[in-house]
Amino acid sequence: MDPEGTPGEGVGCTGWFNVEAIVERKTGDVVSEDEDDTEDTGIDLVDFIDDTCGSVQTGDEAPGALLHAQETQAHAEAVQVLKRKFVGSPAVSPLGNYNPCVDRDLSPRLNEISLNQGSGQAKRRLFLPDSGYGNTEVETSLLQVAGGGGQDVQAGGKENTRPDDGGGDATQLLRCSNLKATLLSKFKSVYGVSFSELVRSFKSDRTTCADWVVGAAGVHHSVAEGLKQLIQPFCSYAHIQCLTCDWGVYLLLLARFKCGKNRLTVSKCMSTLLNVQETHMLIEPPKLRSAAAALYWYRTGISNVSEVIGETPEWITRQTMFQHGLEDSIFDLSEMVQWAYDHDFTDDSVIAYEYAQLAGIDSNAAAFLKSNAQAKYVKDCATMCRHYKRAERQQMTMSQWIKQRCEKTDDGGDWRPIVQFLRYQGVEFIAFLAALKLFLKGIPKKNCIVLFGPPNTGKSYFGMSLIHFLQGSIISYVNSNSHFWLQPLADAKVAMLDDATPQCWSYIDNYLRNALDGNPISVDRKHKNLVQMKCPPLLITSNTNAGQDDRWMYLHSRMVVFTFEQPFPFDQNGNPVYELNDKNWKSFFSRTWSRLDLQEEEETENDGSTCRAFKCVAGQNLRTV
């Protein structure tokens, strides 16, 4: 690149461009007026820009700016309302951090001028400021209900009553955002008690219950007076209270319907009777285990503010009567054992289920359900009941036992089907009676009866029906590998071994000869010591004739064999031709009582029973107050 000031010409785009100025006038020439430089001040360009358009445009922007300012102010006020802040003096903090000060109170704007930056943190105060104008941190607004009523309901469901200028209509008064909260609040203000304290909540409208509590608002006074007569066809018990308020009559009803109903059915029924909309009613079932609720119904029922029809429900009586209250607090195991003994319940599950169902009518059962040791009580009750039953059974003779079984069996049986079945099988009835007499007495060598025959001849049907009537025990050879398979014989008056096979007969021939004799044997019991006992009469059914088989020749003299040869008959409907049940066996033993040489009891109790009634409940001493 050439140095600066080089006179040489450049080449291309970098070359120097030489222009020679054209001078038309020289120094000393006369200048004309048109070319005078002193007059060239730019005055001729004053009107070069037209300002008329600008003034017109400025006049159009003023309304827009005003509208923008108004909208901005409106938006700011809306935001302030939503944030629940005051729009007034800046000295009032939205958080309520207001400290009284003379300068601030006199001139809040002057107090805002400060050189020090104040702290924005809230300070704790011992006393809240109270200017008398009711300034609060949260801005609350009252919801005025449409209509001429005098009830204002706040957003939270609370209410403030004001004098009513005109007649109020419950239909219009209850048109609010939270209808149920309004009804509950009005109920508490009228009756002085919360509706939820008297009832328990059902989430489903289709849950069935017999007892219902109804709170209806806006009922006409004439309808409320006639409800006592209108509701009688539907209820067996009704407790009616009617109190007036600015909505009309607020009715409270506790009703026990004749059949179980759900909330929808009760709502339709009461809406028809009271001429009130279903949405204007509170319907819930009562609290059955609340002593306070039961006491409320009891106290109001005996006062003059209520009308009561029917008998008081048992859940009210049980919790309000003094005697019932004492009984509910104490559980007596002896009463439970006595109940299980009287009903012949010895199984734990049956005792627990049946006794729990008595909680509604038995105070001791109710106390049993309230206990935390129900499993222990059930186990102890079943154990004691089995002990009592076993001791009672051991003390009874066979005649007493059969007599007791006959007393517990219903009448109406016939002894003829049993005799006809024996004759159908070719069994001599007189021989059978003779063998049965010795069998029941436990005579040695006559302590076992064997029913032999081909399959489907009714051997098991005949033997099972007899054992069921005599409430005997069943043993099975399938458990012979256990040391305790003969344990049921220790608690039985009569026993049965069904379907003895050749292996079973071999086992009996090897180990149970003395059992068939009716002599004392030793039986091993689980978790207990060995017991020495006399084997009860044993009935055996088999398809093998052990009385004639030479393999078991030592058993021939120890058993009496009856052969069933004919197949068991059925009618065209599949029912047995010869019905063998407890009623027929009762008739059979009553008919053949003397032939079986069963003894009659000479001394009986006043009620005619053969044995003294067992009582395990402790005696009670009556004390006068």
Curated annotation (Swiss-Prot):
EC number from the UniProt entry: 5.6.2.4
Reactions this protein catalyses: Couples ATP hydrolysis with the unwinding of duplex DNA by translocating in the 3'-5' direction; ATP + H2O = ADP + phosphate + H(+)
A UniProt-annotated Pfam family: PPV_E1_DBD
Localization: Host nucleus
Region described as DNA-binding region: 162-328
Family indicated by similarity: Belongs to the papillomaviridae E1 protein family.
Name of the protein: Replication protein E1
Species assigned in the record: Macaca mulata papillomavirus 1 (Rhpv 1)
Taxonomic placement: Viruses, Monodnaviria, Shotokuvirae, Cossaviricota, Papovaviricetes
